Amino acid sequence: MSLLDMGGDMMEDDWEFASSSNPKRTLVLVGRTGNGKSATGNSILGRKAFRSRARTVGVTSTCESQRVVQEDGDIINVVDTPGLFDLSTAADFIGKEIVRCISLAEDGIHAILLVFSVRRLAEEEQTVLSFLQALFGSKIADYMIVVFTGGDELEENEETLEEYLADYCPEFLKEILGICDNRLVLFNNKTTDKVKKAEQVQKLLSLVESVVKQNNGKPYSDELFHELQEEAIKLRDQKKEVELLQGYSNNEIDEFKKQIDMSYDRQLSRITEMVETKLRDTAKRLEQQLGEEQAARLEAEKRANEVQKRSSDEIKKLRENLERAEKETKELQKKLGKCINL
């Protein structure tokens, strides 16, 4: 499948839609496979728009976008993504999906929703932040909101999110919460209580509004967004010009369109390759960093074991010395007793 088949026409249509009827808020769900991104998207939309199942193997295979119109007429555009930042995911797949995600976000991202599950927080999830910053720069942190799924499990345990995080909050998660000003919300995607459903969505949208206000109403956008938008507009304009050509046969018109599509596809390939290069460099750096951290951890464990062994040896030696001293004391007392009797 070519890049054009993957997203060419889709991008053109999206950018054209964005110019005439821009969704007020665009939210992008990212996170590890199986964390509940699709279920969270469905909760936000108020309907089952994305495929979702309770399993650690994700069912989302490509970026998707769905919209909901609120009572006040505002439009919420929700973009669901597969596990883009798992270290095991191929860079070429991620590159294509990043380009697709950007196109679905249309003219910018109002909030990045980092989805974590309270059921399984793993150290490898620290890569999400590194990948996001490598692709979009440190400014992306200003648009991040942390969403925890598994609210049903905490309710069963009669535990609040604050209590859960007080007991278990890895360093990487503390860092993420710190750089996004502790913007976090808990979702129970299994509840059938309409009031609870509405409350958690409203809390999230309130956080989105705070992000929008903090960023002066401007959605996140960078060179990738601008370049993709320019290429899509160029493609649309060129096709319109071809439609207006006179004195050419239908076959010739079709050939012109084909050449335009091929040119657009080449530009998409170039942009995607640029994204893939960034991803590979980041993955290589992260793997090296994780390797160094693991080596340092093993070295620390080795030293701790050595200290413990040394301490055990010293304690054993002290005990032996004490026992010998006690024995010598008893022998001395025995000798003294004999001397007194004499």
Swiss-Prot record:
Keyword Nucleotide-binding applies: yes
Keywords, ordered alphabetically: Coiled coil, GTP-binding, Nucleotide-binding
Region (G1): 31-38
Upregulating conditions: Up-regulated by brassinolides. Down-regulated by 2-aminoethoxyvinylglycine (AVG), high CO(2), isoxaben, and propiconazole treatments.
Positions of region (G3): 80-83
One Pfam entry name: AIG1
Domain AIG1-type G: 22-229
Region G4, annotated ranges: 149-152
CDD domains with a match to the protein in the record: AIG1 (cd01852)
Summary of the tissues where the protein is detected: Mainly expressed in leaves.
Name of the protein in its database record: Immune-associated nucleotide-binding protein 9
Organism: Arabidopsis thaliana (Mouse-ear cress)
